[in-house]
Regions:
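Mid-to-C-terminal alpha-helical segments outside catalytic/metal-binding sites
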Residues: 1-9, 13-56, 105, 223-227, ...
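A general structural detector for well-ordered alpha-helical segments in enzyme core domains, enriched
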Residues: 44-48, 72-79, 103-107, 130-134, ...
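Catalytic pocket-lining loop regions of alpha/beta-barrel enzymes
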Residues: 113-114, 124-227, 273-277
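Divalent metal-coordination and catalytic microenvironments
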Residues: 7, 49, 57, 76, ...
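Active-site environment of divalent metal-dependent phosphoester hydrolases
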Residues: 11-14, 64-67, 95-99, 122, ...
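Acidic/glycine-enriched edge-of-secondary-structure segments
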Residues: 24-37, 60, 146-148, 169-175
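Active-site gating/metal-coordination segments in enzymes
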Residues: 55-56, 63-146, 150-152, 194-196, ...
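Histidine-centered divalent metal-coordination motifs
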Residues: 7-13, 118, 147, 177
Length: 277
């Protein structure tokens, strides 16, 4: 089965270990679960994805301060180019940038395939007027992958995504972590089946729900609205693929989640075509 990882982090080699550890600590304190000792330099990503049988990967990283935006986007473009066709990259934006329009145009000129935002780490709410301006500036030209859900903060709760979904129907939004990290059932109630421009990814979900609960959520959103993702280096891709394939889904549902939905959003077509994308 073709597998596309729609949610994978990558860091410069010099800081990959430090950055990976910092993110792990950010979540490990909250979740109280064991997180693999992994780093996310490009070589680490490619090795882990190959071991898991993942054919294509979306790389992302977030700018925690505005002046990082263009440098990170150039880095992400280089990593995609250096991956031998195995990776695409989503760029980053920051709502406090002095030139958000310039950042958007630069991101698109680099050939980045989407925008990843992490409100909790970047310090803004999904429905903040400055964030809404970013969605407006992108104008539906590429999709947004948004971290959603964390009860410690009031930045990315599922309800805060709704104004963007309503205001920008031409823009595709992907709510990471099944639309609400650690409070999936609540997210499902307010988001599932309601918005034509909403997808969710299944990353960082298996640790907190049963296989049956995961399937219920998939079917509430519709398998045609769900994307596979590992959230590497948070989790081992091999383990995440194994857990996904073990879910009591139909073969059609697996195929949609593993490849077809993501390929549609990224205009990849079949794996043979995607190899040269």
């Amino acid at each position: 089965m073709q597998i596309l990882d729609f949610h994978c982090h990558v860091y410069p080699h010099a800081i990959a270990e430090k950055a990976s550890d910092a993110v792990a600590r950010f979540y490990q304190v909250h979740r109280g679960v064991e997180i693999p000792d992994q780093t996310a330099a490009l070589d680490d990503v490619l090795q882990a994805q190959a071991e898991a049988g993942i054919a294509k990967t979306v790389l992302c990283s977030a700018a925690t301060v505005p002046h990082q935006v263009q440098h990170i986007n150039e880095f992400l473009a280089r990593k995609a180019a250096a991956s031998g066709g195995r990776c695409l990259s989503f760029g980053t934006l920051h709502p406090d940038s002095p030139d958000p329009k310039g950042d958007v145009e630069h991101l698109l000129e680099l050939g980045l395939k989407g925008v990843k935002l992490h409100p909790d780490m970047q310090g803004f709410a999904l429905n903040d007027p400055k964030a809404m301006k970013l969605y407006e500036l992108v104008g539906g030209r590429v999709p947004f992958l948004l971290h959603t859900g964390d009860p410690r903060f009031s930045f990315s709760n599922p309800e805060q995504l709704i104004p963007a979904l309503l205001a920008f129907p031409e823009t595709t939004f992907v709510g990471a972590h099944m639309g609400g990290h650690t409070f999936w059932k609540e997210a499902t109630k307010v988001l599932a089946g309601r918005y034509e421009n909403l997808y969710v990814d299944i990353s960082s979900t298996f640790f907190g729900v049963t296989p049956e609960e995961a399937v219920d959520m998939v079917r509430a959103y519709g398998a045609e609205r769900v994307l596979f993702g590992t959230d590497f280096p948070m989790w081992c891709p091999n383990d995440e693929v194994r857990k996904f394939l073990a879910l009591p889904l139909t073969e059609e549902e697996r195929r949609l989640i593993a490849w077809d939905n993501g390929a549609k959003l990224l205009h990849l077509g079949s794996l043979a075509c995607a190899a040269g994308a």
